[in-house]
Amino acid sequence: MLLYTAKRILLAILVSLTVSALVFSLLYLSGDPATALAGERASQADIMAIKAAYGFDQPVYIQYFKWLAGALQGEFGESVYFRMPVIDLIVDRLPVTMMLGVSAMIFALALSIPLGVLAAMYPNSLIDRAALLLAVVGQALPSFWFALMLIVLFAYWVPILPASGSDSWQHFVLPTIVLGYYATPAFMRLTRTGLLDVLSSDYVRTARAKGLSPAKVLFKHALRNAIIPVVSLAAVQFGFMLTGSIIIETVFALHGAGFLAWESISRSDFPTVQAVLLLFSWFYIILTFLADLLNAWLNPRIRVA
């Protein structure tokens, strides 16, 4: 286990460095960042002053290492648009994003696990096919389109929920449904597949032969083992949810870190964009690393592979 953990740590570090290099390179995708920050009417003297202030006059590799060293210390510089430290902006917006992610995860698990259990208990039935249809639609439906449909339905046609904002719990209902529904199919399919495998195992057949009730066999023996892969997947999916929150928060005008990223992109606020993308990426890498360790602990064969 120690050797496997060391390998995963090394891989996580390499992936983190690669991601940081890609995020930093976004600064130069649109050309000279100093010119973009100065504006179209800026003089050459203004551009040179911005280059000196932000260190754009130094070699790119030096800029990268300085930026990475600052990022490791939580220092991302000052926001070009908001005129305040980037880390303070993110800390202020992050609770909204975390609240959305946690509520969406709870919604996804609460919907997918019962559906997966029913689909496994009644294979090839109407319930099973309805669950399969839900999975197909959930994977194929664009999240922004689904969000717009819910806004039209529940904020305008039947105005019972707000269309935008983040001041009360009502503002999180529609975003939670959209973000959680996108993750539901993966959990549902994994629950169904895992439960079908467990129900056909020898120890479950033995439990049935002992005269245990179907409910006791399901909840005490089968579901407890079938749900383990779902828990591992939840860690990875939570990282996906935080990344997907950029679109959802923008559509619903939730003032979280995802919406901050969109605001910063539209205003060419490079330091803030880089910080949000890097922190989201690192958080996802950490969750994936923890999920790998959990899988290896639960399934020793993974450590040998």
Question: What is each of the regions a protein language model found here?
Answer:
Residues 15-65, 155-174:
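Hydrophobic alpha-helical transmembrane segments of membrane transport/permease proteins
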